A protein has these predicted regions:
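N-terminal alpha/beta PP-like core and its mobile active-site loop of ThDP/TPP-dependent enzymes
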Residues: 1-164
Length: 164
């Protein structure tokens, strides 16, 4: 039986000592929320808007001096959170933004809430101007390595947000 990426993510966050994940429920992150609900070490802070979640994650990182974690829904979730993430970037606040996505076989077919006028599944590109790095995980076996790189980059040099 294979281990789902959502379960791998929660195990990774627990091993890193993450205690809170901020975000909003959505159909593209429901598997992560299900995995988080089984964790005794991580509390999901459910907000009523993605911008609130981003600002809460920003404030949490400022208070704890550690990278915070923001869990976002695709498309409107990402655009709604952009102001809070950009604010963290301007103030050098470490944050790992994890965005849900639709299955790859839906790319370019305009599934529910896809913000994509060019049919290339690149909606994460809206974050590129203000985050340190953007990753799209196309190969599940690369996920653990990408998460490690994401946290390391968010907290090193001039700290700032990254998007996975």
């Amino acid at each position: 039986m294979k281990d789902l990426i959502s379960n791998q993510l929660v195990k990774y966050l627990e091993a890193r000592g993450v205690k809170h994940v901020f975000g909003l429920c959505g159909h593209t992150n429901i598997a992560v929320l299900a995995a988080l609900s089984k964790s005794r070490k991580i509390k999901f802070v459910n907000t009523r808007h993605e911008q609130i979640a981003a600002h809460a994650a920003d404030g949490y990182a400022r208070a704890t001096k550690k990278a915070s974690v923001l869990l976002s829904h695709l498309s409107p979730g990402l655009t709604n959170a952009a102001t809070g993430v950009a604010n963290a970037a301007l103030d050098s606040i470490p944050m790992v933004v994890i965005a849900g996505d639709v299955p790859t076989h839906y790319y370019g077919k305009h599934p529910h809430q896809e913000v994509n006028l060019h049919a290339d599944a690149s909606q994460y590109e809206i974050y590129r101007p203000f985050v340190k790095r953007v990753w799209r995980v196309d190969s599940p076996h690369l996920f653990p390595e990408i998460m490690e790189k994401a946290f390391t980059l968010a907290e090193s040099g001039r700290p700032g947000p990254v998007l996975v």
